[in-house]
């Protein structure tokens, strides 16, 4: 069994090495609410060519959500845009937008930058300021500030909390490096990448703690699989599980009190839950079928998981208190790797049919599913903490990509591209 598991892992990562990360934005596939984003105006100071373009970052954030279609307003328009609104002389039909964001950047006496911004209504109450604010920051914090402004705009216009400041985790593989496997975290859009752990042996399945301070993962550094939890800030590592055969698929409960995972110590893969305070482990599933890939529902008492008890992999739901379970997925021949949305209303999963493998969404209340991706060999969906976006991996020849798609299907983009393997993306759930 050890040899088989190691073979499967090698196949999973059996592509060429990766190079520098590339960030790219692709065209949307539907119409969203238009919003004007003007270039931030530099006031009484020459524009710093090394700064992060705040308006561009905000545009990308809002577009990634699938709820907005940003329209760039260039500098020559920006200088007079507020005056035109005030004088009611702006051509609304030409701009075709409901709101517009304007901003200014100036340098204060201690060398910090003052960034001010306004979100202005152009339709209901033309000229009314819907949102305004300012930040005093150093140059290296421009990207962070841009994400914060995006969050404010998104919340103001949709009523939904923005998550553009959140982070993702993933595994990189490069067979030519000293350390072939790297557990990394970055901003949700792929920027500011940091290596959290690296090894010559496989690393798999990162899972964030709800507070965003720790990551559970699977390692083979001692020759067989183990589950560990690493504190991101201190670097301390806590051992969780190293039973015979396979230890895998860790998943923190939403309240952070328990960790679900899969063990094959009795022969078949079954689900277990550990109380992280006292270390007590409870077996959840039983029998000869393979049960793995747990994902928590927000009630902290139910899990979605993959089981082959019907003959092919399908998604099931189980109550961890009484053991009652039922099948959820019926789309096509195979469904696996479920990720339950934070609000518990839908599940993202991998659907396989003949030679295709795509991400599908299963609406729990409506009891129906639909395929939302068209990329190649789509895997490992992870839903944003506000239920608006999904990241997943796909393959393009020898390259591996983290894709982002809005749950409404209106926009998709590639956020991380490498010439090699990138696997197991996981979106932090801390807002």
UniProtKB/Swiss-Prot annotation:
Name this polypeptide is given: Tol-Pal system protein TolB
InterPro entries: 6-blade_b-propeller_TolB-like, PD40, Tol-Pal_TolB, TolB_N
Keywords: Cell cycle, Cell division, Periplasm, Signal
Family per similarity comment: Belongs to the TolB family.
Gene3D superfamilies: TolB, C-terminal domain, TolB, N-terminal domain
Superkingdom in the source lineage: Bacteria
One BP annotation, GO: cell division
Localization per Swiss-Prot or TrEMBL: Periplasm
Quaternary state and interactors: The Tol-Pal system is composed of five core proteins: the inner membrane proteins TolA, TolQ and TolR, the periplasmic protein TolB and the outer membrane protein Pal. They form a network linking the inner and outer membranes and the peptidoglycan layer.
Cleavable signal peptide: 1-19
Function, in words: Part of the Tol-Pal system, which plays a role in outer membrane invagination during cell division and is important for maintaining outer membrane integrity. TolB occupies a key intermediary position in the Tol-Pal system because it communicates directly with both membrane-embedded components, Pal in the outer membrane and TolA in the inner membrane.
GO cellular component, one term: periplasmic space
